[in-house]
């Protein structure tokens, strides 16, 4: 299928979202679509797949002008859209999720479960992925859920697959396998739209790139004819001096110390510390135990043994409330499920963790809350006209700032950040990095879990690498390289 979208306009009320966008897709190509959150990428793809119509412009598919009535019609035509927000029903099994709305039945209306399993196994084998079909999808990791979504698209036998941040929660091995599958699909004539903020992936896998900014298509280029700095300038409309802001940290005394921390089946004998003003990067492959260690420190999960000291005093943490009272804060990797209530306003979300500060004998002091939220909005440069705006209406970068504001407001001594810039555009990432620098300059200690190796190297003062639930290596900023981190992450000796 060949697609040509010309002069696409879309507005919602008085808000012009797309203003004359051009985009094309050739059979067998991988075309990257990049832009800051809010640039209009998803809106453009929603118009292509029939979620809503354009106000102006044309879509031509294989030479025929086309406008799908809905996403079901576009799916039947061979267009699959794997969205960033996973379409997984947690209470249903893996098999049920794969076939929801597309169940295979016999002439009596009974499910042909054996045939369904065979088809699912065929797709899973292509993904080199194994998981029990009767397992509840909600029990799967985020990475496993992403692969289920990809499997659903492959089962449609689609001619065009749109992928929105498909690798965000995948391990390096899973990403490599996905890229193999993508190349195999293009050889069969399938065209792929690849929406991502990961520049290294785009240069590794894509043929062309279209950059969008503020509802317009800035430029379409062949990957071989462009570079990182050019794309960043097109995305943000300005030069970014450096990808990561300069750090000139001043370290104080150890704030948090963890000793002999163990939980059977998850991690063993974890021992580390983090100092005032320091960013401790935590690296490792997916499933190594990085998040599990931090969840246990914050009191979400129990441990078998170990001790936690804050400012030299032993803590007893039985649940997150104890952790918060002690001076810990935890920004989880899944901000939309665990960090935010999307239907609530910015004010309500930021206030959730700070109710004690605004209440008097059970009554919330509204003015104090509003003043505090306004301060956080200005301090973190959250782009909004009102603090009453539902958080779900914000871009990914601004949603992440709301999560940070929510926890910074508790005045923590230690801030744990799990994948702090996942799914955030390059401009918003730099703002988050600058904020992290400001927080450490005030003496806050930050523990940053990240699967983005350039981010780990660019922002960490010290790097702790986890392999199979144990600390396999530790590196200071000056000696750290991607190769050394990956050696430790895969169980090797960094000194070999």
From Swiss-Prot:
Q: Which residues bind ATP?
A: 35-42
Family annotation (InterPro entries):
AAA+_ATPase, ABC_carbohydrate_import_ATPase, ABC_transporter-like_ATP-bd, ABC_transporter-like_CS, P-loop_NTPase
Subcellular localization, as worded in the UniProt entry: Cell membrane
Per the UniProt entry, the Enzyme Commission number(s) are 7.5.2.7
Catalytic class of the enzyme: translocase
Assigned protein family: Belongs to the ABC transporter superfamily. Ribose importer (TC 3.A.1.2.1) family.
What name has this protein been given in UniProt? Ribose import ATP-binding protein RbsA
Output the Gene Ontology cellular-component terms: plasma membrane
According to the record's subunit comment, the protein's assembly and interactions are:
The complex is composed of an ATP-binding protein (RbsA), two transmembrane proteins (RbsC) and a solute-binding protein (RbsB).
Q: Entry's PANTHER family? A: CARBOHYDRATE TRANSPORT ATP-BINDING PROTEIN MG119-RELATED, D-ALLOSE IMPORT ATP-BINDING PROTEIN ALSA-RELATED
> What does the UniProt function comment say about this protein?
Part of the ABC transporter complex RbsABC involved in ribose import. Responsible for energy coupling to the transport system.
Annotated keywords: ATP-binding, Cell membrane, Membrane, Nucleotide-binding, Repeat, Sugar transport, Translocase, Transport
Q: Where does the source fall among the domains of life?
A: Bacteria
Mode of membrane association: Peripheral membrane protein
Q: Which GO terms describe its molecular function?
A: ABC-type D-ribose transporter activity; ATP binding; ATP hydrolysis activity
What is catalysed by this protein?
D-ribose(out) + ATP + H2O = D-ribose(in) + ADP + phosphate + H(+)
The ABC transporter domain is annotated at 3-239, 246-493
